[in-house]
C-alpha cells in the first residue's frame, strides 16, 4: 500500500481497487466537523501516526472513522476491559483509551519493533498505565491470557478488536469469545478485502482470503454469538469487518 496525506486524516490507497474520490472526500468533510483538530485527542493521534511512519511501520492502521467507531462502541457498552490482537503502532488502542477514561486494554503484537514503537506512542499519549502491550505470537499468548481470565487474574473483556494474520483469525475469535463477558462485542478487521472474499481465484490461492472465509463460516455456526459483516467504502478503500456480539 501507498499513502497520501490530507489536512484532516491519513488516506490509505489500495493498489487492488480503484477508489472513488468521494469516499475520502466524505471522510475528510465529516471528520473536519466530528473530529476536528480542536479535539483533545487530535494531537496525540496525529503524533502516533507520524511517529509510526517515521519509525518505518507499515501504513495499515485502522482508518480514523473506524477507530472512532470502535471507541464509541466501547462507550456504548460501558467497557472497562478491552482486548486487541495486532497492536501495530498503537493507534486504535490510543483512540479507544482517549474516549474511554476508565478502560484498560491488553494488546498483543508479534513484531518486536512494532511493539516498541507502540509503547513509545502509548507513553507519549499518556496511556502507559491503561494500555498493556504483550509481545509475541497471539496463538501462544491467548491461551495464557485465557488462563488468567479463568483464575480471576484478568477481568473478562467487553470488547475485542482482531486485526492480525487472517489464517488464524478464527482461532483468535474463539479465544476472544471464551474470554468475553455476555453482550461483549468482537470485531474482526479486513474480512472483505476489496471483494476478494468471494472471488474464486483468491479463494484458491490467497491464504488471507481463505482465513477470512473460515472465520465467517465458523462464526455463522457458533451458537455463542450473533454476527454480521459490514462492508466499508472509506479512506482504506473497499473492505469490511465482521462484528459479533457474545450472547
Curated annotation (Swiss-Prot):
Pathway: Secondary metabolite biosynthesis
Binding site for substrate: 163
EC number, UniProt record: 2.1.1.-
Keyword check for Signal: no
Recorded superkingdom: Eukaryota
Family annotation (Gene3D superfamilies): Vaccinia Virus protein VP39
Keyword field: Metal-binding, Methyltransferase, S-adenosyl-L-methionine, Transferase
Annotated Pfam families: Methyltransf_3
Self-association state and partner proteins as the record states: Homodimer.
The protein, known as: O-methyltransferase imqG
Amino acid at each position: 500500500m501507498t499513502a497520501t496525506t490530507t489536512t484532516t486524516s491519513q488516506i490509505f490507497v489500495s493498489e487492488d481497487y480503484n477508489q472513488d474520490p468521494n469516499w475520502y472526500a466524505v471522510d475528510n468533510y465529516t471528520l473536519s466537523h466530528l473530529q476536528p483538530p480542536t479535539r483533545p485527542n487530535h494531537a496525540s493521534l496525529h503524533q502516533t501516526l507520524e511517529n509510526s511512519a517515521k519509525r518505518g511501520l507499515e501504513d495499515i492502521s485502522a482508518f480514523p472513522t473506524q477507530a472512532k467507531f470502535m471507541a464509541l462502541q466501547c462507550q456504548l457498552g460501558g467497557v472497562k476491559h478491552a482486548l486487541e490482537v495486532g497492536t501495530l503502532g498503537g493507534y486504535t488502542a490510543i483512540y479507544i483509551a482517549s474516549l474511554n477514561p476508565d478502560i484498560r486494554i491488553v494488546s498483543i503484537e508479534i513484531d518486536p519493533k512494532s511493539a516498541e514503537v507502540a509503547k513509545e506512542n502509548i507513553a507519549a499519549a499518556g496511556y502507559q498505565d491503561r494500555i498493556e502491550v504483550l509481545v509475541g505470537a497471539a496463538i501462544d499468548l491467548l491461551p495464557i491470557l485465557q488462563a488468567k481470565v479463568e483464575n480471576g487474574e484478568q477481568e473478562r473483556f467487553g470488547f475485542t478488536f482482531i486485526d492480525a494474520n487472517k489464517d488464524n483469525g478464527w482461532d483468535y475469535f474463539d479465544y476472544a469469545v471464551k474470554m468475553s463477558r455476555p453482550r461483549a462485542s468482537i470485531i474482526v478487521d479486513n474480512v472483505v478485502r476489496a471483494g476478494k472474499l468471494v472471488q474464486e481465484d483468491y479463494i484458491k490461492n490467497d491464504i488471507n482470503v481463505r482465513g477470512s472465509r473460515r472465520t465467517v463460516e465458523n462464526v455463522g455456526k457458533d451458537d455463542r454469538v450473533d454476527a454480521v459483516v459490514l462492508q466499508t467504502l472509506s479512506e482504506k478503500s473497499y473492505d469490511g469487518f465482521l462484528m459479533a456480539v457474545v450472547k
